[in-house]
From Swiss-Prot:
Protein name: Rho guanine nucleotide exchange factor 11
Feature: compositional bias, Low complexity: 651-664, 1338-1353
All residue ranges annotated as the RGSL domain in the record: 306-486
Amino acid composition bias (Pro residues), ranges on this chain: 149-161, 1091-1100
Comment block on domains: The poly-Pro region is essential for plasma membrane localization upon stimulation.
Composition skew (Basic and acidic residues), residue ranges: 521-533, 601-637, 1112-1124
Subcellular location: Cytoplasm; Membrane
The keyword Glycoprotein appears for this protein: no
Coiled coil: 444-470
InterPro entries: DBL_dom_sf, DH_dom, PDZ, PDZ_sf, PDZRhoGEF_RGS, PH-like_dom_sf, PH_16, PH_domain
Presence of the UniProt keyword Nucleus in the record: no
GO MF annotation list: G protein-coupled receptor binding; GTPase activator activity; guanyl-nucleotide exchange factor activity
Ranges where the record places region Disordered: 1-40, 128-175, 200-231, 263-286, 490-555, 573-680, 1084-1141, 1223-1320, 1332-1423, 1453-1522
């Protein structure tokens, strides 16, 4: 041969130059002659592989369509790889870019850490020289060439010095594998090329230029840089071997499948060359045997090109169903399919008709978007809320779903990128990529391959749990049907198909026990043969007929399947041994790859250990053989899977078979046994896999084996004759099948519970793996639960024994789901399910910390009876079972004739099932909430409250969250001011709202403050804990995501919190739950747990001198009633105060956009009697919430509506009355005198504040509250007047409930404080003693101010309200106690109070009234009037549903009178009692005593209860009329 042949060999050997010596690389023989191609054009194509370094790829490109290398960074990755300026880029990663835009080329280059470029540039001889110049080694080393005799048939060994040394045992880096593969492949290419060269005549036709270099730094772990130049042969040689010029060969994205086939192609080309050629350094050449493969004209370049393009973009994938099927197989087995399935279903929705899109939209919501959806996809919450809203309203959701698709796209693109990485490693054939080779652009063939891929998908689906597999199957069917691809039916519809699918049904119902089959059946034999050939496929879902057409092209006598990196590497390491495989010997485990890619016959070939593999792998294989010998029952078909998993586990420790996390991030499908999954992650844990498992099988397998169902028990039609089925209607057949499914799945569930008991619970208890407390949480009452289901299964068996057709099943259902049996089931199930999530978290922690427990869990979960399910999957089976009962019963009802007793009973059983499920869900929720509260309590930091001066927060310094029940929690933003917001985690407890601020791991309880409106220096402090019986909830009109919480406590001024939710739906949820919690807290205030440090009872004791009400509440108003109310509170308007009883209306006004929040506060309701503008505003802030706690009665709503009507009447008529302005002016004057603050803005103390320092003398205050003629009959009228309005029990915000006597105590305190403060009071005009009650007419309000009638003492029509003024500066402390509830004494009337007298004496009133300023009051009234109307409308709507009951109630209330206490919630009974003269106390009782005892006596103070009330029941009853 010519001397140039060794040069050629040497040129190609530079591919593996990692181990070459420097002289070798710099030998002068490397200079080459130009090829034919380069002679004509002067340009050659070459391929380079560039690895990105810290500076990127190190080159820039320019141009469009013709993309050129613009610049190369000196010393960068591109320069090391041999890229030159001016080179034209022909291909990127095997993709032709001659017609691609500049941006597309850049995108392709940046798609990974490696890029393979095919460049067209000037003759590379200069590059070869420059490359040599970079090598510092001396040149001119002599070359030794010799002719070596032919070696045996296997490929020759590369030069000894180029063989890499032993690799570290645990080195998993992908780059090292890739380097090793490329080296070995390229060495073989050298030899193959030498076979080819003689075929093409003289040396002039041999490649004279071009080289393939792979330069790596010494000690580098991977393929850092390299320059690849493929031989450029003559035109005919390039045509024959086009693959040689394709960068796909050495691109990081090239599959070893292609490499294997290229090698085979070359072997075919050179198989007839028998003349040995010379080689350098001992390289041998020998003739090759003729091997004919199935693909003579295979062009891997074209295939790689096309597939690379398709697997880059989802849009292209959608247009190629076969490629999409391959990608789906990867997604279903190695990643989360939810985003892709959601995207595809949304695509169908976009193109569906309106009718179809409505139903499909709901399915998409239920499967992908709902909170508990089985395939939940994460999209922005606002987008999710918008989709929900549109679907609920049957609106078109195409636009928002399109946005949701875009939100899911990044995750899908990441999965596509991961799959491309898998293809780079040669793993594409695992997912059926080999089938794509046969497409050839034939649409029919494309459809067939797609259907084949989807059939394989069905087998993968069968290994998922049913709650995931069913929706995944639905989504897949939806899209494929839309694309016109026929998908394998999950549940065949006709009888024959059902019979065929019976053995496979367990794949779709993982809880179904596998069926027993007689050992002599043909299916058994087929299954055994199948297992012998492919044992690993038992647990990764091998289809009945292989769905992958893989080609077996041996590269050496030891056959290696394409697509398995581990075996390819192992194969090349074993090449030097030339040993034939020993049949039947143990082979190395190959991880989770299907074995039909690794073996083609029933014999198992051993892949011997490589040079760098330790003996550890052999020891582990011995142990894995032991694991196969564990005893098992004949029905235990999954034992082979467990043994295979053990081998899988052991094989991972070999360095030659280890893969990096990048190469196989998830080396096994999601359905692989847990032991197999964990073993690859932690191979060191596999040392005792055969110790506990056999012991378990010997002890417990006998108990488990009896749980297997009878043959074909899962298919009802297999249990009855064809003649029986033929005589039934289709509806009855369907009904029997559903009943049979109920029976079979119940038996399967019972079996699962026994597995939990025998394999986990009993062993954990026996081996003390968990403390008893923890074990009791994980399995609290497992034996009881098993007994319940066992007894039901026995009843089902008895029913089944009666005959093949079950006529009636309702009695059996009711026996389990109704009556005492239902109570038993729901209690036991709730107890079992409550702590599961908590216990599973505990198990997770123990597995991380305790290796012994970790080993136990691995062994137990790998037990075949667990059916590849983990403990967390098994333990939730009870909860899953409870959800399936209503569905199964619904299906039975659907196929049962309506109107029959059977149908009715089944409907009842279904409803009871739903109640059981609801009960258990609530129990689980409450338990988890308690657990979370315990965690929050540990992180709670309330130190800031200890330093806070806020009285509201003081009592929560030692707040204990665990003593309360949590209703809801979530993030909210608190708008403290326009410029200040705070992110909170808010807890809604049964009686409190807690605003927590997160700081690191702590949850802070911290008071915040802001400047109060109206004063630049004073600040208002907000407590982070709010009592629900003192709050109101209102929406923010200008922000649909925000709502107000108005807190009204006696401990401080009213406060408004503006909280903002993430979405409007979140806000609605918060408001609904808050309102419900407020109702419950005000209805049952005693039920809420008391604070750890309740307020001191000191101030309350003196107030309770009189008889106390039967219901005692620890209310702020009760505790702190004696404290004068703060001066710092801004005031309200007089008109607002006028309607004192209407605190609900006032409280519900926060949405008004007045001057500021303080204005809203001023409008808040106050439980006191005074309606003075300023006083009322101030007062409202504190007392309101105290007035709320009252039991809820239906009549309370009616009373509230009556009060609204009455207040509305007075609000409307007040400004029309001639004395209106006088009252206002009179009200302002005394207030100015009494308080330093502006009369209309604020007051230092409230008329209703007990013991206020500024009370007027008794006479003065009494005058304010009394009418003109009261001097003679003062006690009755005063009492009545005060009681009538002030002491009407306040009603709750939502229902208008009247407060019980306790509220009256508060009001009494308030009244006394009003007098003390000298503030205004609004009282109802009372009739003079002995006068007749005049029925109130709507017009009677006009006569209210008329004092002349009252002066006579005989006429007082309607409910007349007057503003009572303090007489002057507070004189005596005794007057404080004068509650407004106690009537003022006649002598006190004249005492300096000109205002009351004008009211009482019409003549005097009129002149004074004009002097007052009505405009502000009128303006204020407008808002209140409209708000009152709104509230009244709401209440009347609610009253419509109980109109009849309301009328009866009015009748009963109208005629009722009580002597001692007023029934809580009854306005009319109170009125009746007040008008009852027999109850009136002595006429001249001191006011002081009244004020002190009034709040204990009920709705009215002692005096007030006796005073006749002018407002009759008739009046009250006449006004509402819903």
């Amino acid at each position: 041969m010519s001397v140039r042949l060794p040069q050629s060999i040497d040129r190609l050997s530079s591919l593996s130059s990692l181990g070459d010596s420097a002289p070798e690389r710099k030998s002068p023989s490397h200079h080459r002659q130009p090829s034919d191609a380069s002679e004509t054009t002067g340009l050659v194509q070459r391929c380079v592989i560039i690895q990105k370094d810290q500076h990127g790829f190190g080159f820039t490109v320019s141009g469009d369509r013709i993309v050129l290398v613009q610049s190369v960074r000196p010393g960068g990755a591109a320069m090391k790889a041999g890229v030159k300026e001016g080179d034209r880029i022909i291909k990127v990663n095997g993709t032709m870019v001659t017609n691609s835009s500049h941006l597309e080329v850049v995108k392709l280059i940046k798609s990974g850490a490696y890029v393979a470029l095919t460049l067209l540039g000037s003759s590379p001889s200069s590059m070869g020289i420059s490359g040599l110049q970079q090598d510092p080694s001396p040149a001119g080393a002599p070359r030794i060439t010799s002719v070596i005799p032919s070696p045996p048939p296997p490929p020759p060994l590369p030069p000894p010095q180029r063989i890499t040394g032993p690799k570290p045992l645990q080195d998993p880096e992908v780059q090292k594998h890739a380097t090793q593969i490329l080296r070995n492949m390229l060495r073989q290419e050298e030899k193959e090329l030498q076979d080819i060269l003689p075929l093409y005549g003289d040396t002039s036709q041999r490649p004279s230029e071009g080289r393939l270099s792979l330069d790596s730094q010494e000690g580098d772990s991977g393929l850092d840089s390299g320059t690849e130049r493929f031989p450029s042969l003559s035109e005919s040689l390039m045509n024959r071997n086009s693959v040689l010029s394709d960068p796909g060969l050495d691109s990081p994205r090239t599959s070893p499948v292609i490499m294997a086939r290229v090698a085979q192609h070359h072997r075919r080309q050179g198989s007839d060359a028998a003349v040995p050629s010379t080689g350098d350094q001992g390289v041998d050449q020998s003739p090759k045997p003729l091997i004919i493969g199935p693909e003579e004209d295979y062009d891997p370049g074209y295939f790689n090109n096309e597939s690379d393009i398709i697997f880059q973009d989802l849009e292209k994938l959608k247009s190629r169903p076969a490629h999409l099927g391959v990608f789906l197989r990867y997604i279903f087995s190695q990643a989360d399919p939810s985003p892709l399935l959601f995207y595809l279903c949304a695509e169908v929705y976009q193109q569906a008709s309106p009718k179809d899109s409505r139903s499909l939209g709901k399915d998409i919501w239920n499967i992908f978007l709902e909170k508990n959806a089985p395939l939940r996809v994460k999209i922005p919450e606002m987008l999710q809320a918008e989709i929900d809203s549109r679907l609920r309203n049957s609106e078109d959701a195409r636009g928002v779903l399109c946005e949701a698709q875009e939100a899911a796209m990044p995750e899908i693109q990441e999965q596509i990128h991961d799959y491309r990485t898998k293809r780079t490693l040669g793993l594409g054939s695992l997912y059926g990529e080999n089938d794509l080779l046969d497409l050839d652009g034939d649409p029919l063939r494309e459809r067939q391959v797609a259907e084949k891929q989807l059939a394989a998908l069905g087998d993968i689906l069968s290994k998922y749990e049913e709650d995931r597999s069913a929706p995944m199957d639905f989504a897949l069917n939806t899209y494929m049907s839309h694309a016109g691809i026929r998908l394998r039916e999950a549940r065949p519809s006709n009888t024959a198909e059902k019979a065929q699918s019976a053995p496979d049904k367990d794949k779709w119902l993982p809880f179904f026990p596998k069926t027993k089959k007689s050992s002599n059946s043909k299916k058994e034999k087929d299954a055994l043969e199948d297992k012998k050939r492919n044992p690993i496929l038992k647990y990764i879902g091998k289809p009945k007929s292989s769905s992958q057409s893989t080609f077996h092209i041996p590269l050496s006598p030891v056959e290696v399947k394409p697509g398995n990196v581990r075996n390819i590497i192992q194969h090349f390491e074993n090449n030097q041994q030339y040993d034939a495989p020993e049949p039947g010997t143990q082979r190395l485990s190959t991880g989770s790859f299907p074995e039909d890619l690794l073996e083609s016959d029933s014999s198992r070939s051993e892949i011997r250990l490589g040079r760098s593999e330790s003996l550890k792998g052999r020891e582990e294989m011995k142990r894995s053989r032991k694991a196969e010998n564990v005893p098992r029952s004949r029905s235990d078909v999954d034992m082979d899977a467990a043994a295979e998993a053990t081998r899988l586990h052991q094989s991972a420790s070999s360095s030659t078979s280890s893969l990096s996390t990048r190469s196989l991030e998830n080396p096994t499908p999601p359905f692989t046994p847990k032991m197999g999954r964990r073993s690859i992650e932690s191979p060191s844990l596999g040392f005792c896999t055969d110790t506990l498992l056999p012991h378990l099988l010997e002890d417990d397998l006998g108990q488990l084996s009896d749980l297997e169902p009878e043959p074909d028990a899962q298919n009802w039609q297999h249990t009855v004759g064809k003649d029986v089925v033929a005589g039934l209607t289709q509806r009855e057949i369907d009904r029997q099948e559903v009943i049979n499914e109920l029976f079979v799945t119940e038996a399967s569930h019972l079996r699962t519970l026994r597995v939990l008991d025998l394999i986990f619970y009993q062993r954990m208890k026996k081996e003390n793996l968990m403390p008893r407390e923890e074990l009791a949480r994980l399995f609290p009452n497992l034996p009881e639960l098993i007994e319940i289901h066992n007894s039901w299964c026995e009843a089902m068996k008895k029913l089944r024994e009666e005959g093949p057709i079950i006529k009636e099943i309702s009695d059996l259902m009711l026996a389990r789901f109704d009556g005492p049996a239902r109570e038993e089931l729901q209690q036991v199930a709730a107890q079992f399910c409550s702590y599961q999530s908590i216990a599973l978290e505990l198990i997770k922690t123990k597995q991380r910390k305790e290796s012994r427990f970790q080993l136990f869990m691995q062994e137990a979960e790998s037990h075949p009876q667990c059916r590849r399910l983990q403990l967390r999957d098994l333990i939730i089976s009870e909860m899953q079972r409870l959800t399936k009962y209503p569905l199964l019963l619904e299906s039975i009802i659907k196929h049962t004739e309506g109107g029959t007793s059977e149908h009715e009973k089944l409907c009842r059983a279904r409803d009871q099932c739903r109640e059981i499920l609801k009960y258990v869900n609530e129990a689980v929720k409450q338990t988890e909430n308690r657990h979370r509260l315990e965690g929050y309590q540990k992180r709670l930091d309330a130190t800031a409250l200890e330093r806070a001066s806020n009285p509201l927060a003081a009592e929560f310094k030692s707040l204990d969250l665990t003593t309360r029940k949590m209703i809801h929690e979530g993030p909210l933003t608190w708008r403290i001011s326009k410029d200040k917001t705070l992110d909170l985690h808010v807890l809604l407890l049964e009686d409190l709202l807690v605003l927590l601020q997160k700081q690191d791991e702590k949850l802070l309880l911290k008071c915040h403050s802001k400047t109060a409106v109206g004063s630049s220096d004073s600040k208002q402090t907000f407590s982070p804990v709010l009592k629900l019986n003192a709050v109101l909830i209102r929406s923010v009109a200008t922000d649909k995501r925000a709502f107000f919480i108005i807190c009204t406590s006696k401990l401080g001024p009213p406060q408004i919190y503006e909280l903002v939710a993430l979405t409007s739906s979140d806000k609605n949820t918060w408001m609904e739950l808050l309102e419900e919690a407020v109702r419950n807290a005000t209805r049952h205030p005693g039920a809420a747990p008391m604070p750890v440090h309740p307020p001191p009872p000191g101030p309350r004791e003196p107030a309770q001198q009189g008889p106390t009400p039967s219901r005692v509440e620890l209310d702020d108003s009760d505790v702190f009633h004696g404290e004068p109310e703060p001066e710092e509170l801004p005031g309200g308007t007089g008109s607002q105060q006028r309607v004192q009883g209407k605190h609900q209306v006032l409280l519900e006004d926060p949405e008004q956009e007045g001057s500021a929040e303080e204005e809203e506060l001023g409008v808040l309701p106050c439980p006191s009697t005074s309606l003075d503008g300023e006083n009322r505003g101030i007062r409202t802030r504190n007392p309101i919430h105290l007035a709320f706690p009252g039991p809820l009665f239906m009549e309370g709503l009616a009373d509230s509506a009556l009060e609204d009507v009455e207040n509305l009447r007075h609000l409307i008529l007040w400004s029309l009355l001639p004395g209106h302005t006088m009252e206002t002016q009179a009200a302002q004057e005394p207030e100015d005198d009494l308080t330093p603050t502006p009369s209309v803005i604020s007051v230092t103390s409230h008329p209703w504040d007990p013991g206020s320092p500024g009370q007027a003398p008794p006479g003065g205050e009494g005058d304010n509250t009394q009418l003109a003629g009261l001097e003679g009959e003062r006690p009755e009228q005063e009492d009545m007047g005060l009681c009538s309005l002030e002491h009407l029990p306040p009603r709750t915000r939502n229902s208008g409930i009247w407060e019980s006597p306790e509220l009256d105590r508060n009001l009494a305190e308030d009244a006394s404080s009003t007098e003390a403060a000298g503030g205004y009071k609004v009282v109802r005009k009372a009739e003079v003693a002995g006068s007749k009650v005049v029925p109130a007419l709507p017009e009677s309000g006009q006569s209210e101010p008329g004092p002349p009638e009252v002066e006579g003492g005989t006429k007082a029509t309607g409910n007349c309200f007057y503003v009572s003024m303090p007489s002057g500066p507070p004189d005596s402390s005794t007057d404080h106690s004068e509650a407004p509830m106690s009537p003022p004494q006649p002598d006190s009337l004249p005492a300096g109070q000109t205002e009351p007298q004008p009211q009482l004496q019409g003549g005097n009133d009129d002149p004074r009234r004009p002097s007052r300023s009505p405009p502000s009051l009128a303006l204020r009234d407008v808002g209140m009037i409209f708000h009152t109307i709104e509230q009244l409308t709401l209440k009347l709507n609610r009253l419509k549903d109980m109109e009849l009951a309301h009328r009866e109630l009015l009748k009963s209330l109208g005629g009722e009178s009580s002597g001692g206490t007023t029934p809580v919630g009854s306005f009319h009974t109170e009125a009746a009692r007040w008008t009852d003269g027999s109850l009136s106390p002595p006429a001249k009782e001191p006011l002081a005593s009244d004020s002190r005892n009034s709040h204990e006596l009920g709705p009215c103070p002692e005096d007030g209860s006796d005073a006749p009330l002018e407002d009759s029941t008739a009046d009250a009853a006449a006004s509402p009329g819903p």
